[in-house]
Amino acid sequence: MRGGGLICALVVGALVAAVASAAPAAPAAPRASGGVAATVAANGGPASRPPPVPSPATTKARKRKTKKPPKRPEATPPPDANATVAAGHATLRAHLREIKVENADAQFYVCPPPTGATVVQFEQPRRCPTRPEGQNYTEGIAVVFKENIAPYKFKATMYYKDVTVSQVWFGHRYSQFMGIFEDRAPVPFEEVIDKINTKGVCRSTAKYVRNNMETTAFHRDDHETDMELKPAKVATRTSRGWHTTDLKYNPSRVEAFHRYGTTVNCIVEEVDARSVYPYDEFVLATGDFVYMSPFYGYREGSHTEHTSYAADRFKQVDGFYARDLTTKARATSPTTRNLLTTPKFTVAWDWVPKRPAVCTMTKWQEVDEMLRAEYGGSFRFSSDAISTTFTTNLTEYSLSRVDLGDCIGRDAREAIDRMFARKYNATHIKVGQPQYYLATGGFLIAYQPLLSNTLAELYVREYMREQDRKPRNATPAPLREAPSANASVERIKTTSSIEFARLQFTYNHIQRHVNDMLGRIAVAWCELQNHELTLWNEARKLNPNAIASATVGRRVSARMLGDVMAVSTCVPVAPDNVIVQNSMRVSSRPGTCYSRPLVSFRYEDQGPLIEGQLGENNELRLTRDALEPCTVGHRRYFIFGGGYVYFEEYAYSHQLSRADVTTVSTFIDLNITMLEDHEFVPLEVYTRHEIKDSGLLDYTEVQRRNQLHDLRFADIDTVIRADANAAMFAGLCAFFEGMGDLGRAVGKVVMGVVGGVVSAVSGVSSFMSNPFGALAVGLLVLAGLVAAFFAFRYVLQLQRNPMKALYPLTTKELKTSDPGGVGGEGEEGAEGGGFDEAKLAEAREMIRYMALVSAMERTEHKARKKGTSALLSSKVTNMVLRKRNKARYSPLHNEDEAGDEDEL
């Protein structure tokens, strides 16, 4: 603070010196003009220009908008000394106004000297805290295990026979099912081993028990035979199937009777089977449950596994060679085959021991960077790779407590060795064996601590030195007892969500960062306070006012009374009531100057004017005892209100803002780092496929198999229609089959002829039953009736008027022609009614001969058909007819002759 006052004094002094050197000496300004007593002439030499007198502090000026210092007025000598002094006073007032209004809230304080009524002391240094940190940080690699929810899967083979009994009633043109009975029968063990697996055939009969009664079904209601197994038409990706028949057998047709038909279809099907913990049962892909452990058997103590069936229903075959029913190839290596018969089917599968076929834990994550830290009574395993933190106890977890956990140690060692060889083989060494911890949420952590090669060498050297210092006959420390093998086993249940571990990791991440940051802040703050306390204890001896004001939090005055400080409260003074004088020289003592600028102030706006001296940090001193010898080159900056005043050669020069002075920071940097960004990646304990596959029964697979069963083992495209002639053909075929080879040959011919006749009749019947065929037949009948009607009319017309019927055009021309031209030449024709009688007689004769020729030809044709005698008789008759004389009579006139002539 004193440095600032000294600079201000130097500035004012320099300004006064510059003004004094440029202006002549002048009398002091009257106090009444400004209410301020100011020195107008500098001691030690003439002044060509009096320094400007500052304006009263009560005058308010407008607020400055720029912080650049105003240019100094040019030192041109005015024509009048009084005018020069007035101009200098105005300039100084303007500068002071700008300084005051730059920071309007800057207060001046009058601090009376303390009397010792109030004394204070400083607190002693405190003991700084230590920030909390984790203990026993250990780096290493880890393998995280979770509960194995996947079922145990294996292949099984089903043997069963589909029995279908259908009751059909046959009508004349249709058939109707009156009932269909369907059932499944198991295949006996002997037939599976001796027939199906050895020869690839199956018996056509099915013997099974229903309602505690044994029954037998015969395929096609015939005697027992061996039927060959053939591959199913449709094979899935996971299973194959074989069967003996495609079509259902229907009974022969007998109209108006109920008939029964039996179909036995032997089916062998490979299916997937699955079983879940505790493996007391398994289910097939068809949806059939088997209430027996898949590990049940008669070897290696497996008879203790669960079963719900009688002993005679189960059979275990050692040295079983399975056969591929498609290629007929035999397996190269034998297996132990389990066979179980149920009321509906027989199932077979390869037996394997329970250990190590199944494991209740499975590997989840392999973490190549895992940090273990001890917090209180727990371990926290954190990994940035998977953004999780696992919390465990400080004690290790024994693997012997895990039921069916043989795979944990094996898989953990393999994964740890693989990660170590890939990343840490050249830089680290393993510390001991893998350690196992059970984390919250059901996660088992296999942790392998690591140590860098450098630290390992240091530890080895230290260990060797400790061994050298120990006595030779020291008793070795007892080894830790191995965990008891009789400890109760349990199954670890793993939660399906990892969010709690993610939240724990986030909390630990934030907690570690915040605790570290707050710890550094607390330590730095405490140390800083202790350092400042030492400085304050020393600084209070130099400037007790500043130290006391900073400590109390408000402006006070203080002085040391031994080891304590006496303080008194300072009185604030409004900035408008304070003015600074332009000279720092003591007029009555040449060579002596004030070290701080002189000021005049009022406590109140209308109060009396008090002379004083500007102290440090806007303090107004009531005395003017701050003196110093005048020096050459004096320059000082003093805090005045919200800015600085500059004195040069103990005279006011100009003003400037605080921003124009370079600031040197005295703060201690606080090491606070921002929380680093961390992105969470999706992390699933169990994938969607694992959750879907965790159930004992896959309903999708069951429905798919049930709906695909008919497509695989039945012919759905062949249709057997109702046929009334089927019984007849079946009887004929059976009749000719019983007559040997000759009967079969004759039967083929007869069957062909009968088939043709039946086909023709069936074709006509089908054509007539068709609506379009019936319409065509109706149209043909109608056309025949119309033709018969016209033929009948023609015959009637021919009988009534043959000439008109035979020669309609000729008769029509004769009717329309001139009757006079028809008679021909001469008058005889005219007299005879227009007709020539001779020609008419010739026409009649021609017609008679035509009838005679027709009769002779018919007689000869009939005689040729009858024989030689008839032909001779016909010849004689013809000769007689040719020799016959003409008739000797004259034609009689018909009474209708006139009508006939009209028609002609």
Curated annotation (Swiss-Prot):
The terms describing its cellular component in GO are: host cell endosome membrane; host cell Golgi membrane; host cell plasma membrane; membrane; viral envelope; virion membrane
Indicate whether RNA-binding appears among the record's keywords. Answer: no
Residue ranges annotated as motif Internalization motif: 889-892
Which InterPro entries is this protein grouped with?
Glycoprot_B_PH1, Glycoprot_B_PH2, Glycoprot_B_PH2_sf, Glycoprotein_B_ecto_C, Herpes_Glycoprot_B
GO BP: any one term: virion attachment to host cell
Tell me which family the UniProt entry assigns to this protein.
Belongs to the herpesviridae glycoprotein B family.
Name of the protein described by the UniProt record: Envelope glycoprotein B
| Species, as recorded | Human herpesvirus 2 (strain HG52)
Lineage at the top is: Viruses, Duplodnaviria, Heunggongvirae, Peploviricota, Herviviricetes
